[in-house]
């Protein structure tokens, strides 16, 4: 799971912004304070 989260962080909003779900997930991670970062 952490590997997926890390890849999302590396991709950023520009990389996953192509899909609403991915963008929402990425924003949700940052709202949580990015505990995996």
Curated annotation (Swiss-Prot):
Organism: Vaccinia virus (strain Western Reserve)
Family: Belongs to the poxviridae A56.5 protein family.
Recorded superkingdom: Viruses
The name this protein goes by in its record: Uncharacterized protein A56.5
